[in-house]
Regions:
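Active-site anion-handling motifs in enzyme catalytic cores
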Residues: 1-280
Length: 280
């Protein structure tokens, strides 16, 4: 009952339609930007690292691609040119991310929360003709049970191009490690390492209209820093570990809590996460 007021025609564009040929919509692609709550003063660069990876992959397969950006969480209100959108990401706090008829969604690298899965269940959607590339194993399991054509795509940040090896790549970065985890690292690593926080970046120029561009640039800069300087990255962040793996950087992934176990399943078979107990 609590979801009954959400049932409307917007759901019809979730994916139950024939994808157009690229030339039919002129090679236009919509990429995610993120509009954060005004009271929040720090931002997660992992969001824009996903956008950068998506753009990089599209440019690899479509040299004439044209891009514009739209808020990930309000595609039901999308009013720009008809476009293809790669639905790489985490969905969602509410149903407003569902694309309307002007967006042609391609679901790759997609995670759906339990809340959204409940929403789909209430709607009793038939997923038998629905194709989805799942970022994690829980999303894969859900859509397999629904009879969808689901596969394990992992995260598109794993598709970033490999860096060129350089003698300047001699830094150890600790990315979003809390004090307890850092204290358990060997002394020679702690002495040499540089701490980075990519989950809570403060924006220098607070401007709600253009701040996403600053976040995007910050994400580009942090990826370049990893690529040009890192010899080792130790992190608790999926969207640090995955892009660094793609770049060819040695990575140690630390798992703060069992709640992250499914999130890190995007890297299953590629990188084993270590826990507090492993460090002790």
């Amino acid at each position: 009952k609590k979801y009954s007021h959400l049932i409307n025609k917007k759901f019809s564009s979730f994916g139950m339609k024939k994808y157009p040929r690229r030339e039919e919509i002129g090679g236009d692609y919509c990429l995610f930007k993120y509009l954060y709550i005004p009271g929040i003063k720090a931002y997660n660069l992992g969001d824009y690292i996903q956008t950068i990876a998506t753009r990089s992959l599209i440019e690899l397969i479509d040299k004439n691609a044209k891009f514009h950006f739209y808020n990930r969480d309000s595609f039901s209100l999308y009013n720009k040119k008809e476009s293809i959108c790669i639905m790489q990401g985490w969905f969602a706090d509410d149903y407003n991310f569902l694309p309307n008829e002007r967006i042609f969604p391609v679901y790759i690298g997609t995670h759906f929360t339990k809340k959204m899965q409940e929403y789909f269940d209430v709607l009793n959607v038939d997923f038998k003709d629905f194709e989805i590339g799942c970022r994690d194993l829980s999303t894969l399991d859900y859509f397999n049970k629904k009879g969808a054509n689901a596969y394990f795509s992992r995260c598109l940040t794993l598709t970033l191009p490999k860096r060129e090896v350089s003698a300047k790549q001699n830094s150890i970065f600790l990315v979003n490690l809390n004090h307890e985890m850092s204290s358990l690292l060997p002394d020679f690593i702690k002495k040499e390492a540089i701490e980075i926080n990519q989950k809570a970046i403060k924006i220098k120029n607070r401007n709600l209209k253009n701040e996403w561009q600053e976040c995007y640039k910050e994400a580009q800069d942090i990826l370049e820093k990893y690529a040009s300087e890192a010899k080792l990255v130790i992190t608790t962040a999926l969207h640090c570990a995955a892009p660094c793996i793609a770049l060819g950087i040695p990575v140690i992934l630390l798992q703060e809590d069992k709640v992250y176990e499914d999130r890190f399943s995007a890297l299953k078979g590629i990188l084993k996460p270590y826990t507090f107990n492993d460090l002790k």
